[in-house]
Every structure is written in structure tokens, then in C-alpha cells.
From Swiss-Prot:
ATP binds at residues 114-120. It is found in: Cytoplasm. Pathway: Cell wall biogenesis; peptidoglycan biosynthesis. This is UDP-N-acetylmuramate--L-alanine ligase. HAMAP family: MurC. GO terms for molecular function: ATP binding; UDP-N-acetylmuramate-L-alanine ligase activity. It comes from Brucella anthropi (strain ATCC 49188 / DSM 6882 / CCUG 24695 / JCM 21032 / LMG 3331 / NBRC 15819 / NCTC 12168 / Alc 37) (Ochrobactrum anthropi). It is an enzyme of class 6 (ligase). Its EC number is 6.3.2.8. The gene is murC.
Amino acid sequence: MKMPLNIGLVHFIGIGGIGMSGIAEVLHNLGYHVQGSDQSDSANVQRLREKGIEVFVGHKAENIGDAEVVVVSTAIKKNNPELVAAREKLLPIVRRAEMLAELMRFRHAVAIGGTHGKTTTTSMVAALLDAGHLDPTVINGGIINAYGTNARMGDGDWMVVEADESDGTFLKLPADIAVVTNIDPEHLDHYGNFENVRAAFAQFVENVPFYGFGVMCLDHPEVQALVSRIEDRRIVTYGQNPQADVRFVNHRMDGAASLFDVVIRSRKGEATEIKDLRLPMPGQHNVSNATAAIAVAHELGISADDIRRGLGSFGGVKRRFTHTGTWNGVEIFDDYGHHPVEIRAVLKAAREATKGRVVAIVQPHRYTRLASLFDEFAACFNDADTVIVTPVYTAGEDPIEGVNSEALVSRIKTAGHRDARYASGPEALAPLVASIAEPGDFVVCLGAGNITQWAYALPKELAEQGKK
């Protein structure tokens, strides 16, 4: 049974969140009556209002109004006044992933999972299905530049969604195709240990129906180990690994664009080659993500020409190596990377894309993450000539003794880096960058906090610095 249209007013608590806003937008486009609230105004809130969705700023019991159903994300606390009011009214409380699962029942669905690369890969799958005239509905965890939004309502039979593994609810998603980009020990506060993370991803793939399949990265040791344990579902492997079913080869750079070929081999021995693919993004990690999208597209019957065209015009995702400006020949970028694996991949891509130097500005995100991955953070900046570390973005966490940005700078140095520095805040960045950066250099701002605002302000601040 699909969700009926007469379920009444649906109220989203935290509607401005990147995951919640996309679901609300698609529900609204399907004809459901949607409203919501968020603790602050934002671009997502404004976009929803422009589409005719009522959004309250601030959380109050009366915001519930005549709602018949309430949707919450894991970020909503149990004492939230709207959640308390909804429970008092005995309204159904629906988790974000459960509502996403209901939407997926309207379409055939591709779900993209993995510790890193989900948002970009989701966007790439959407772009290739779009190029193949399948007109997909898309719900992503980031703003897709081609759409200007994280959600898109298509008229086709397919839906492409990002599957967030952070709280285990991705196992509710009824996907026909499950993509796994990589598996790393993240979200242990929920899972307890890495073995439970592994088990969750195994279940994610095994949840696809017998006529579906998994698409899994053979370059990642944990994913390859998982492939060997999946016994009763069809798997399509991808990567640079010579054993991959869909393998990228001949990867080279053309400025900030990646050029590569793909070889597709069936288990019956047939081989297909797609040559001269161009992805307007640097980095082997992005080529790997593109190869995952190609694997999905090929299985769905999309032609090589459409794949080539879809990749060539791929516009990227906001906060994924996003260019924010130029100052004195210095290119400035903003990136969401906040885990050592992500940071290493982004800086490697920057190194490949420029003949100049790479300056990394990082805002560590959460004391708990910094504490649990301290040694990994100390060793992930090798491709940056200079590392500038700013204060930790707490995300509401209490400090942990001995775990701070100054300590990280010290550890980066003792791990062998030649130039790591501490900056006390955004006001210190422009003078510091102006004294370091030269024409041809890349400055990459990294983090999941408010460093994105600094990245967009930096070009102007550097220009002002030059006038002093």
C-alpha cells in the first residue's frame, strides 16, 4: 500500500535540515499538505516558503496546529515542545528515514550508502539517469548545483536517494539498487563498535529484492570483504581494482578536470569500453564515485553517449570543492570534508589540479571526533604545503581536556609536517593567507561547521587586506 493523500497535515520538526527539507519538498510536490518549523531561518527554509510551504521559526507547541502526522529527525531532542505536544495529542511520530522509505515506495529506487562520498555519488547517479532520459526524482544530502536544491521531483519511474547510515535508519529504505562507496569506523556512538557498522552495511545490501543488486567499491578493503560475505544477492563491483566489473583506467588530469576510460566486463566474459570520459572535477575519489554512477547507469540501459554527456556537464555539489573566489591569482575553495579520509582525498585532488602550492584551512568538527581520530587527523594533511588550524566547531559539545586545535597543530608537526599553524579565528585568516599564498596556489577551507561562511568571505577580505 502506498501512502494515501488524505493523511492530513504533515508537520516537520527541523524542516530546514538538509535531509528533512528534501523530503518535505518532494511530499509537497506529490500533493501532500506540508508545514514545518526550524530553530532558525536559512536558505533551505526560504526555498520551502517560496514553494508555498509554511515554515515557523522557533519551536513552540502551538506550531503543531492541525497536524495529523509529525516527522522528526534524530537531531530533535525528546523535550522539544512540538514533539511533546504531538505525543500528548497521540499523533503518529515518523522518523525521517521512515518517511523517506514511504516516498521510495512510489518509485523504483537507488540508495547510495557509504561513510564518505554519498552526496556526490547520489548527484552523479541523478545526472546520468537524467542524461539517459529517465527523469528521476532525487533526494540528496547536499545542494546539487544543477538543480539549486537538494531535492527534485521527476516524472520518471526512478528515485535516487542518499542513504544516511549515521543512526542505522538507512536499513528501513526499500531500495532496488544499493550502492556502497566505502565503510570506515564512523558513528560508533550509535553502533557501539565497528563490527556493528559492518553488519549494518551487509544488511543494507541484502535488503535489496532478488531482482535488484548491490554496487560496491572493490578498492576499499572493508567493502571488498563485505562483497565476499554477500551470498544471495547480485553484486556489481567497481573501482580501479583490476578485478572490478566496472573499472576506471587511464586516469589523467586536464587542469581541474579528470579524464578517464571505463571498462565494463560481465561475468560471461563480454567487455565494453567507454573511452574519453571527462568529469569537470579533480580527484581520483571523484572518478571512483563517477564509476559507481556509471555502473548503475549501464545496468539501467543508459547508452555510452548519454553517460559521456551526463558526466561532462556534471555541475557538482555545493560545499564539495566549491570555488568561492580568486585573489591575486590564488584560487579559494570550500569543502565539507571533516573526516581524515575526506580531507586526504580533497587535498590530493587539489594537489593534482594545481601546479602551485596547496594551503589547507581546517575547522575541526566536534571534540569527540577530534579525540577519537586524533592520530588520523595529524597524518591527513601531507598534500598541503601549509596547514592552518582554527578553533574547534563544537556543535554543542563540551570541551575534552587536551583535545583542541593547538594540540592538533603540535601533533601535525610531530607527525612530520613542515608548516602547520594555529589561527585564533576567521579574523586572523586573511592576514595569514596574504602572507603565505602566491599566484597559482589553491587555498582549501575544510570543515562541516561555519567555515563555509569564512570561505566565501575570504576573497573579499584578502582584497581589502591588499589595500591596507
